[in-house]
Amino acid sequence: MTGKILLTMAAVALSASFGLRAQDGTTAYNFLNISPSSHVYGLGGHNISLIDDDVNLTEQNPALLGPEVEKQVALNYMRYIGDCNFMGARYGMRINDHSAWAAGVQYFGYGSMTATDVEGNITGSFSANDIAFSATYSHDISDNWRGGITMKFMTSNYESYSAMAIAADLGVNYYNPESDFSASLVLKNLGGQVKKFNEKYDKLPWDIQLGITKGLSDVPFRLSVTATNLNKWKLPYLKRSDDNSTTSPLQVKDSFTSNLFRHLVFAGEYTPTERIYLGLGYNYKTRTDMSTYSRNLLSGFSLAAGMKVRGFGFGVALAQPHSGATTFMLNITTNINELLR
């Protein structure tokens, strides 16, 4: 019965998506590409195949949600570029031995901005923010396969303008605990605006992702590769002809190799115990997106670390998504059942 519910919800989401995506406009809502999970953020920003009892991972792939997150609460906070602050909360609940649900909210605040008239005269200040609400359902298809769906509602408020959008994520995961191998496929941000800012509808950053994670048998280490933007092969970028000069001519990079690696995110984790992890991620797209600006050796790299202590899980991540802007993310998770013991 629950399997039929999952298929019905997926069909409705796809039907709604095709209708909404027919609207003309530009891509917006790129804040949906920022993961609220410090674990994922520190592994390159994308990972849809990571197996862990962390309800935050459902944001990457609804099929990663399972009964193991029974009554788990997760909080996240990130100081982003400039005065931007991202924060949110997520809660997971077991339905039965094969199904679970979760709900979450994410707030993206962009700080105070200067308001001007058409002649450039300062008239005051205003604030801007995005809020995303989500609900996730997952169900075990078999012993090794699990499917899931996330429905999202987004509202945007920029000065006196507002907009709303709906979207869905569809995911499936295969996991073999004996070989510690996980593989996932996710269709993200299928949907569109239901209320527009002006005369045109903005498109959502829809994405097809494929990922694998493999634990090594002899050492406590696991590797991940995640392919993103599979719905669009060409991802050209601009690069200075001289990396040491900010005024040298720009060149378009659009070779097969550059396109290939701009789709891929690589990550490795050291897990000495079930309670500790140390991770390193590399996102070539993030690094090359900064090619027109000054960048350093660490551009595109990110770090993640986490540990569980007395019923609480703590996760931190460091990354540099933009030139000269190092970001820090903090996650705190706990299980209500453990707190009440």
Could you describe each region identified by the protein language model?
Residues 1-26, 268:
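Bacterial Sec-dependent N-terminal signal peptides
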Residues 21-341:
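Subset of outer-membrane beta-barrel
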